[in-house]
A protein has these predicted regions:
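Fe(II)/2-oxoglutarate oxygenase catalytic core
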Residues: 1-144, 152-184
Length: 184
């Protein structure tokens, strides 16, 4: 059963993906070819399997409906097709997703809301941290988190010390015509 935990504009959904579906995804990921990008130590898996795509699409739709309900807005739906496998030693420095003014993966003009779906928890390190809010999140497999991309929600990911950290990241654009996103 899904369970939501909210703190300001940060929401964690536990059990977004069932343990059975996580096991199916992990089996597929373990046997899939890894892709790389220049100057990036992480590996990427483009999900080609119909059953796995169905699992990820269902999770994405659940995320979308929860985001729209919580923020009272309509958001872009980019879909999911890429899993990121993080390398030991990887970390993500303190940053804000909206500052970059980069389009979303789906081509929407900006990143108002960020989301992460966690497909593993058999790792040490790799915690999502919001230092200014004193929030530290140790993810669990099957959970998801979403939060506004504004300066108030600057965050980082601690160095991955061991294990396998698998995620699907998404960026959502507010399509309702408002400049800022906030939960009333």
């Amino acid at each position: 059963m899904m369970r939501k935990i909210k703190f300001r504009n940060i929401t964690i959904i536990n059990n977004l993906i069932t343990p059975q579906d996580i096991a199916k995804l992990r089996k597929y990921i373990d046997y899939s070819p890894l892709q790389t990008e220049e100057n990036n130590p992480n590996k990427f898996i483009n999900v080609q399997d119909n059953e796995c795509n169905t699992i990820l699409s269902k999770a994405q739709q659940l995320l979308k409906s929860n985001i729209e309900e919580d923020f009272g807005i309509s958001v872009s739906d980019e879909g999911i097709g890429t899993v990121v496998k993080f390398s030991v030693g990887w970390e993500l420095p303190y940053h804000c997703d909206q500052w970059s003014n980069l389009p979303t993966y789906g081509g929407a003009p900006k990143r108002d809301i960020s989301s992460i779906i966690y497909l593993s928890d058999d790792f040490r390190g790799g915690e999502l941290v919001f230092p200014d809010l004193d929030v530290f999140i140790q993810p669990t497999a099957g959970s998801a988190i979403y939060f506004t991309g504004t300066e108030e929600y600057m965050h980082q990911v601690t160095p991955l010390l061991s294990g396998t950290r698998l995620t699907c990241t998404g960026f959502w654009c507010n399509l309702s015509g408002y400049d800022n996103v906030s939960i009333p």
